[in-house]
Regions:
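Membrane-interface alpha helices of multi-pass inner-membrane proteins
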Residues: 152-174
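Transmembrane catalytic cores of multi-pass membrane glycosyltransferases
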Residues: 23-67, 169-176, 183-264
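Hydrophobic transmembrane alpha-helices
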Residues: 80-85, 132-143, 156-160, 176-185
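Hydrophobic core segments of transmembrane alpha-helices in multi-pass, intramembrane catalytic enzymes
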Residues: 72, 76, 123-135, 173-181
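Membrane-interface helix-boundary motifs at transmembrane edges
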Residues: 3-4, 84-94, 142-149, 185-195
Length: 265
């Protein structure tokens, strides 16, 4: 009995992983997923938008059931693990359980666009994992650069580049996170961080590679019937509204209200 108690947290984590394995097996392929199944890899990557790694993972997943289940389960598990690890609560199983419960009780509209189909999953969830890792590393570098291992720094640089090929919004967000981290690091430490500078440059290179995809030029010109800009005044106006109105509102103002409310509960 004591032996089982000692490894109770491990059993919970295995249970969460197995749950996502089962969900991957039970989730049917959507029309878009079948399209990825029917075409060869080079054709799929050249015809679609700049989410190159997302499309690569999706293509591999729909062609191999075992890899599909493993990638789905590992990525879903990493979201929970990184969230709990970021707040240094990974030693207590209750926080893994709470995070898992919150993840599986999201509104069905959100679930259907993320976990409910593999095209959405491989665009949103890996991008979320990598963005969380970038945020974690930026905060850790600012707080105490000496505690960051060399391996973590090299992984951070790789993620800064390759994390840009999943989702447009998070690709831009990754660059902003690193840029803000550079500024904060300079004011706190009175010097520049080599790794943050290189990470920012790599993230910008990734953004350039992504947005040079011809589909984005078709979207800008209104020639792509599958994708469109949700702003009648064009792409530049939409970008301005997003950057100067929506981002401050939902990243800072609303979050401060939420955090203030939580602090008094």
């Amino acid at each position: 009995m004591n032996y089982l108690k000692q490894y109770e947290s491990f059993f919970w984590l295995i249970g969460i992983f197995i749950f996502y394995l089962i969900m991957a097996i039970l989730t049917p392929l959507s029309t878009t997923d079948w399209h990825a199944y029917k075409v060869n890899l080079s054709q799929y990557l050249t015809q679609e938008n700049g989410r190159y790694l997302g499309h690569l993972f999706e293509w591999v997943a729909v062609h191999n059931v075992i890899l599909k289940a493993l990638i789905y389960a590992i990525t879903s598990f990493l979201v929970i693990y990184i969230v709990v690890y970021m707040v240094q609560l990974h030693t207590n199983r209750i926080y893994f359980i709470l995070s898992f419960v919150f993840m599986v009780t999201v509104p069905n509209t959100i679930y259907s666009e993320t976990y409910g189909w593999f095209t959405g999953f491989f665009s949103y969830i890996p991008a979320t994992v990598l963005s969380l890792f970038i945020l974690f590393m930026v905060v850790k570098i600012i707080e105490s650069h000496d505690t960051v291992s060399e391996m973590q720094l090299w992984v951070f640089l790789l993620v800064s580049l390759f994390g840009q090929f999943f989702l447009e919004n998070l690709s831009i967000a990754n660059s902003l996170i690193i840029l803000i981290g550079m500024v904060v690091y300079f004011f706190v430490k009175k010097r520049l961080s080599y790794f943050l500078i290189v990470g920012f440059m790599l993230s910008c290179i990734g953004n350039i590679i992504m947005f040079l995809n011809f589909n984005y030029f078709l979207i800008k010109d209104g020639l792509n019937t599958h994708y469109s800009i949700s702003d009648s005044q064009g792409m530049i106006h939409k970008a301005g509204v997003t950057l100067f109105k929506l981002v401050p509102q939902y990243m800072f103002i609303n979050q401060m209200i939420i955090l203030t409310a939580v602090s008094y509960t």
